[in-house]
UniProtKB/Swiss-Prot annotation:
This is Large ribosomal subunit protein bL35. One of its GO terms (biological process) is translation. The gene is rpmI. Pfam families: Ribosomal_L35p. Belongs to the bacterial ribosomal protein bL35 family. GO terms for cellular component: cytosolic large ribosomal subunit.
Length: 67
């Protein structure tokens, strides 16, 4: 049976930590920022850990992990 492929979109958007958490960037940062509060823009920086159930789904799409 051939090797399973990792979804390209998952490679670009997510990282898996050493403890197995799936990290992703925050959304709502592309346009319309003038209407958003400074606090919202500040808290959307960086990355966040996905909820456990979403992380399981992402791991299914990356059968051999992500670098």
């Amino acid at each position: 049976m051939p090797k399973m492929k990792t979804k390209s979109s998952v490679k670009k958007r997510f990282k898996i930590t050493a403890t197995g958490k799936v990290m992703a960037g925050h959304g709502n940062k592309r346009h319309g920022l003038i209407n958003r509060s400074q606090k919202m823009k500040r808290t959307n920086r960086g990355t966040m850990a996905l909820p456990e159930q979403d992380g399981k789904t992402v791991k299914q799409w990356a059968p051999y992990g992500l670098d």
